[in-house]
């Protein structure tokens, strides 16, 4: 028993653990979050720059080539997009003595405009110092921006600065000239954000966002804030601007996103709000993801404020100081999201990420976070006080990993196949992703689903199929491979098929039998499977723990028989099939021509299926005599009858005709009469005696008639049937006058039938004879009507006969007259009449110009004319002419006869 337990543990499959659905649609019970659109990485050059570890970052701006970072110490560092800086060529700038609050590149990336609380506006050059300058002002600037054409000659080299007023600085000969574009009051608050696109300048203070048009020098439109600016102070949560194509301005302020579009020609422009909606965070940066056509998506960076004593994020923004923030339990979470605007106030959230690997202090507020992007480069940056994070769009490798993490296996595998060439050498190639999917389902106890994936994942790869077999074997789920394992293209090593067979042998015997029957024996070592099957059968027969032992043994015996057939051990296979009473034994005998091995077991074959056994016997009639078969099944008359029926349907076994009559009489009476009518090889006398003794009326009557004893047949029919119609029909078929007379004599004892017989026999007998046969002193029902009909029919018959005679005479007279007229008709003979034999003219003259005599021709009433000389050489035909027979008509008659 220890060996038994070991084998069961080796090949056993735990079906109870497999609760997975066979379909692939149910990937995970938990709904997966939105798929990220970005991954977040530190800059590569961060580790090479010492200042990155110590500096506090306060501002940032982007250009296609550079990143400019302002620090709390007043320094500005110029780095590339990967965080590397060449400080020998572009050393750090020191334009301010305090924290740099704002930075701005010009469009060419040649200059940087910066400001700080030291009341300075500084234009610094990057490899160019022609336009560098420092403007001292009386206020602390809150926002700055270059004009789009700052570097162009004769453009004025303008830039703007926002505090309470919006001031335009234009370069003159020796200094910058300041011009107020907008003057704000104290209640209007500070201008915390300004931007310049073409000739449109947008700026935002506490009263809203305005768009100023240069040239007309007027404000085109104003967008009011939708939040309470007294509670959400702009100093804590400053607004953000982003210009898009077609003069579209996106404003991110507090938790609101507004999309404003400037329409119309210069001088008649106006603003239209296309979208305005709220998001679940305080916005710190805004950019966009370009799409085809006019479609686009917005990329937002912000803080989500949470905490037990955090009632209203807005109130925190207005009242929180550094000290109160440190004491508050409100926590800030850095988040990004991608949204697609739909309607005026509706949007669709495409992705939402919480950046958990960022170190945020407990007093972090939205103004401390900056988010910028270069959309056409798909490059986005997030700046905190201590870190610079690059948001890189998800590639196929990242997308696959995320899908695998959330068990979105179908999507992961489809993406891996779509980018197979790109991912071939990575850890998310289609091959490796497929393995991870299988592993994931097996670990989740969903082995059936894993098995359903194998065809798609493994395909024609032999290595992958064999890996899957080993993996399922380790998980004790090998039986699930029975329906999916390929038997060709690819063909696996025999050990793979043997693992599945042995697992099913010990856990699912029905599957084992089916696999043995359907798989080619060339796929595995049949001798190994035979040994294990024999051992398993012995084990089952001794076990008391297995339910339905007999059924399990029968299934395994059936499978073992097929294995013996593969090994060409036909006697062993037939022995098992015979014991199991398996219908397939007949197919085996036919296929392998094994009749000689079972001809001594005909009776057993009959018990399995008599129809197939009989067919088998008849197909092998040359190998076994009918007498041998009849002797083998002597004690089974029904089988004998079935055998003889099949045998005689092939016109064989005539020596058993009398035996067949007896068997039909004993077991199939309904088929006896058809057999008697069809077969002619039985002894009629014996058959009649048998039927008579058994009281078979119809059969006895038939045999009496067949032996020629019609009188007895008629007499028995009248006596037994008591139905004169069948007797009359029989007499009509025989058409014997004496039989009718005999019938009249027999029916005389049955007066009720006599009237009907008189009517039917009137066409076959003389009425006078019928009248003579009428019984005396017997009351015959309906006799007068029958006699009346008899005489009427006879009278009609005589009249019809006379009419036919008269008609014949008239026809003869007419035909005779026509013949006489034809005989008396003359035949015209002219100079152009030709001989019917030689086709020469009858009356032609000879060379001596002497006409032929008329006795030289012969004319017949049929119209044919001959020269007597034309038939001189034909003695028989001459004799015909002399006898008055036309040669031409005789020839036509011969052709017709032929």
From Swiss-Prot:
Keyword Zinc: yes
Composition skew (Basic and acidic residues), residue ranges: 1-10
Location relative to the cell: Endosome membrane; Late endosome; Lysosome; Golgi apparatus, trans-Golgi network
GO biological process, alphabetically ordered: apoptotic process; cellular response to starvation; endosomal vesicle fusion; macroautophagy; negative regulation of apoptotic process; protein targeting to vacuole; vacuolar protein processing; vacuolar transport
GO cellular component, one term: Golgi apparatus
Keyword RNA-binding among record annotations: no
Zn finger region (RING-type): 835-890
UniProt keyword list: Apoptosis, Cytoplasmic vesicle, Endosome, Golgi apparatus, Lysosome, Membrane, Metal-binding, Protein transport, Transport, Zinc, Zinc-finger
SMART domains noted in UniProt: CLH
Region (Disordered): 1-35
Chain positions of CHCR repeats: 614-756
GO MF terms, alphabetically ordered: zinc ion binding
Record's subunit section: Probable component of the homotypic fusion and vacuole protein sorting (HOPS) complex consisting of the core class C Vps proteins vps-11, vps-16, vps-18, and which further associates with vps-33.1, vps-39 and vps-41.
Similarity remark: Belongs to the VPS41 family.
Role, per record: Plays a role in vesicle-mediated protein trafficking to lysosomal compartments including the endocytic membrane transport pathways. Believed to act in part as a core component of the putative HOPS endosomal tethering complex which is proposed to be involved in the rab-5-to-rab-7 endosome conversion probably implicating sand-1, and via binding SNAREs and SNARE complexes to mediate tethering and docking events during SNARE-mediated membrane fusion.
Full protein name: Vacuolar protein sorting-associated protein 41 homolog
Organism: Caenorhabditis briggsae
Gene behind the chain: vps-41
């Amino acid at each position: 028993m220890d060996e038994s337990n070991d084998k069961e543990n080796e090949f056993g499959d735990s079906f109870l653990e497999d609760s997975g659905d066979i379909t692939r649609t149910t990937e995970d019970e938990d709904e997966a979050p939105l798929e990220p659109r970005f991954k977040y990485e530190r800059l590569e050059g961060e580790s090479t720059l010492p200042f990155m570890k110590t500096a506090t970052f306060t501002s940032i701006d982007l250009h296609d080539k550079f990143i400019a970072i302002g620090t709390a110490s007043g320094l500005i560092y110029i780095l590339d997009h990967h965080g590397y800086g060449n400080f020998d060529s572009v050393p750090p700038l020191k334009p301010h003595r305090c924290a740099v609050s704002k930075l701005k590149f010009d469009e060419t990336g040649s200059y940087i405009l910066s400001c700080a609380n030291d009341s300075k506006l500084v234009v610094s050059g990057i490899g160019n110092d022609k336009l560098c300058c420092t403007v001292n002002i009386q206020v602390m600037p809150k926002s700055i921006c270059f004009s789009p054409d700052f570097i162009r000659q004769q453009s004025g080299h303008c830039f703007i600065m926002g505090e309470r007023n919006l001031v335009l600085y234009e370069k003159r000969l020796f200094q910058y000239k300041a011009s107020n574009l907008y003057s704000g009051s104290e209640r209007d608050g500070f201008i915390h954000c300004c931007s310049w696109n073409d000739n449109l300048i947008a700026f935002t203070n506490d009263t809203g966002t305005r768009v100023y048009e240069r040239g007309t020098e007027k404000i085109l439109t104003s967008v009011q804030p939708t939040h309470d600016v007294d509670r959400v102070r702009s100093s804590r949560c400053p607004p953000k601007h982003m210009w898009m194509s077609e003069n579209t301005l996106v404003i991110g302020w507090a938790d609101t996103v507004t999309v404003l579009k400037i329409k119309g020609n210069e001088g008649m422009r106006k603003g239209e709000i296309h979208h305005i909606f709220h998001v679940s965070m305080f916005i710190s940066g805004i950019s966009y993801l370009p799409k085809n056509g006019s479609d686009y998506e917005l990329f937002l960076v912000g803080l989500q404020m949470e905490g037990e004593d955090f009632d209203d994020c807005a109130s925190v923004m207005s009242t929180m100081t550094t000290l109160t923030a440190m004491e508050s339990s409100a926590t800030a979470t850095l988040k990004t999201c991608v949204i697609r605007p739909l309607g005026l106030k509706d949007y669709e959230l495409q992705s939402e990420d919480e950046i958990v690997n960022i170190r945020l202090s407990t007093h972090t507020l939205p103004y401390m976070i900056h988010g910028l992007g270069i959309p056409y480069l798909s490059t986005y940056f997030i700046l905190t006080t201590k870190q610079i994070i690059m948001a890189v769009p998800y590639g196929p490798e990242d997308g696959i990993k995320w899908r695998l993490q959330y068990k979105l296996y179908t999507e992961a595998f489809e993406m891996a196949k779509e980018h197979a060439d790109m991912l071939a050498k990575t850890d998310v190639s289609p091959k490796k992703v497929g393995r991870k999917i299988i592993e994931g389902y097996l670990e989740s106890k969903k082995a059936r689903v894993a098995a359903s994936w194998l065809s798609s994942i493994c395909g024609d790869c032999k290595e992958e199929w064999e890996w899957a077999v080993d993996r399922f074997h380790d998980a004790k789920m090998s039986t699930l491979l029975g329906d999916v394992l390929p038997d060709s293209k690819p063909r696996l090593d025999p050990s793979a098929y043997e693992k599945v067979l042995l697992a099913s042998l010990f856990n699912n015997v029905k599957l084992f039998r089916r696999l043995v029957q359907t798989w080619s024996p060339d796929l595995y070592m049949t001798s190994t499977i035979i040994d294990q099957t024999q051992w398993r059968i012995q084990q089952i027969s001794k076990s008391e723990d297995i339910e339905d032992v007999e059924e399990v043994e029968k299934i395994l015996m059936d499978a073992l028989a097929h294995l013996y057939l593969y090994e060409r051990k036909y006697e062993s296979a037939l022995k098992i099939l015979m014991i199991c009473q398996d219908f397939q034994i007949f197919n085996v005998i036919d296929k392998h021509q094994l009749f000689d091995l079972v001809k001594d077991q005909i009776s057993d074959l009959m018990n399995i299926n008599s129809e197939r056994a009989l067919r088998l016997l008849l197909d092998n009639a040359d190998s076994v005599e009918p007498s041998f078969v009849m002797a083998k099944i002597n004690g089974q008359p029904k089988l004998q009858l079935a055998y003889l029926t099949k045998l005689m349907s092939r016109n064989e076994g005539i020596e058993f005709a009398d035996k067949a009559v007896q068997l039909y009489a004993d077991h199939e009476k309904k088929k006896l009469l058809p057999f008697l009518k069809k077969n002619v090889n039985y002894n009629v006398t014996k058959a009649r005696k048998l039927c008579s003794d058994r009281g078979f009326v119809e059969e006895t009557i038939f045999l009496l008639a067949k032996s020629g004893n019609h009188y007895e047949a008629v007499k028995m029919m009248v006596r037994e049937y008591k139905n004169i119609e069948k007797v009359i029909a029989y007499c009509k078929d025989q058409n014997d006058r004496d039989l009718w007379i005999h019938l009249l004599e027999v029916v005389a004892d049955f007066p009720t039938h006599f009237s009907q017989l008189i009517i039917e026999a009137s066409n076959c007998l003389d009425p006078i004879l019928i009248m003579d046969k009428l019984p005396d002193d017997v009351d015959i029902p309906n006799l007068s009507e029958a006699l009346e009909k008899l005489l009427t029919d006879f009278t009609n018959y005589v009249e019809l006969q006379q009419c036919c005679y008269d008609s014949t005479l008239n026809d003869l007279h007419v035909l005779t007259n026509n013949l006489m007229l034809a005989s008396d008709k003359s035949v015209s003979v002219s100079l152009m009449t030709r001989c019917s034999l030689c086709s020469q003219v009858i009356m032609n003259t000879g060379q001596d110009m002497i006409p032929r005599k008329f006795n030289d021709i012969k004319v017949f009433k049929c119209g044919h004319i001959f020269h007597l000389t034309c038939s001189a050489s034909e003695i028989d035909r001459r004799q015909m002419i002399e006898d008055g027979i036309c040669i031409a008509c005789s020839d036509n008659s011969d052709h017709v006869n032929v």
